[in-house]
Amino acid sequence: MGRIANQTTASNDTDPFGRNEEVAKMEITVLSVTFFVAVIGNLSVLLAMHNTKKKSSRMHLFIKHLSLADMVVAFFQVLPQLCWEITFRFYGPDFLCRIVKHLQVLGMFASTYMMVMMTLDRYIAICHPLKTLQQPTQRAYIMIGSTWLCSLLLSTPQYFIFSLSEIQNGSYVYDCWGHFIEPWGIRAYITWITVGIFLIPVIILMICYGFICHSIWKNIKCKTMRGTRNTKDGMIGKVSVSSVTIISRAKLRTVKMTLVIVLAYIVCWAPFFIVQMWSVWDENFSWDDSENAAVTLSALLASLNSCCNPWIYMLFSGHLLYDFLRCFPCCKKPRNMLQKEDSDSSIRRNTLLTKLAAGRMTNDGFGSWRDPCNSRKSSQSIGLDCFCKSSQCLEHDCSRKSSQCIPLDCSRKSSQCIPLDCSRKSSQCMSKES
């Protein structure tokens, strides 16, 4: 993986039969560690997701397929490159050379664009939450299926570019090299790979996270304005679709996880593509030992990306690590610690939701619900944020026999209202969309 393509039209100023053995040993060591860490990490994630008792979500689906894409990278990019470095030359038939080169680029496309689709899903969940109610699982499967199909098609040209050929006429030494009829062919190929696998995805990711950050900032601003107005006139702010209370802690955690995955991708792959572009666009570039070391180091850094992702999943999703440890009876103590942390987190989350619900009610019965943000988007409402023409209340087993019901602004003609689990003397109830 030191070079995306070995062009047969390159100059042969250096000895084509030799190599720097010290650099080769370093490559073999790093690639071996990378392969085993990537396989163990991604298998752990897949095993944890298979054994989890939690309901599968869209995010779990994307994580699962991103792990599968990283497994493709490990077995069909890192492993062949490791064998290649051990043998120095490619020892195999021509069709195997073409297949290996195809699968190497297939893994790169699949892993990259699966990450892009996962980011797009987070963008929809944060910036357009109502769209997540419209067959979200079906949309996720379409996004994942299209990613695999496009990756397969975009990597197909490898079959026509690479073949088993002599590294020098009359040398009788063969290797799996790329053939370019025109001198500019190698430049076009490297530029296409760089744009398709790195530049376009990075631009899409930056745009998505720009909108996500703007949406979160806007909602924080709305929450601050609502809190200030509530303090002044005692009114209760309306809970809008774009409210901070709707952007749950779980969604924000998945956004953070996706952002870390994106940053790890950029850090690992940026040096590799920079060096590759430098090698084909700089006419003074030569493949001597010093520059070969730079190419090698950048390629090794790129290969580390496939073994970073599973540990990022484990870090941001505690239950995956717990579900993985459930497979090993000897890990009972750390498993219990993770279970306790997850339980404490659930208690804190439920307590926070109870306080938020109680904070929306006025003590004297009916409260006014208003939205401090004047934007049309923030005025859209679901569930709690509405005034109904009529509502029905169900009595709750509280200290008082009657329960007070807050009328809500619904788009429907009627809604059913159920009381909260009250600890106060009077019970208050919130609407439930019928």
UniProtKB/Swiss-Prot annotation:
Pfam families cross-referenced by the UniProt entry: 7tm_1, V1R_C
Cystine crosslinks: C97-C176
UniProt signal peptide: none
Presence of keyword Cell membrane: yes
Topology class, membrane: Multi-pass membrane protein
Positions annotated as glycosylated: N6, N12
Tissues of expression: Expressed in pituitary, liver, gills, swim bladder and lateral line.
Stretches that traverse the bilayer: 28-48, 68-88, 99-119, 142-162, 192-212, 258-278, 296-316
Cell compartment(s), UniProt: Cell membrane
CDD domains assigned: 7tmA_V1aR
A GO term from the CC aspect: plasma membrane
Superkingdom of the organism of origin: Eukaryota
Keywords: Cell membrane, Disulfide bond, G-protein coupled receptor, Glycoprotein, Membrane, Receptor, Transducer, Transmembrane, Transmembrane helix
The keyword Glycoprotein is annotated on this UniProt entry: yes
Main location: membrane
Chain ranges on the Cytoplasmic side, renumbered to this chain: 49-67, 120-141, 213-257, 317-434
Family membership noted in the UniProt record: Belongs to the G-protein coupled receptor 1 family. Vasopressin/oxytocin receptor subfamily.
Protein name: [Arg8]-vasotocin receptor
Protein's organism: Catostomus commersonii (White sucker)
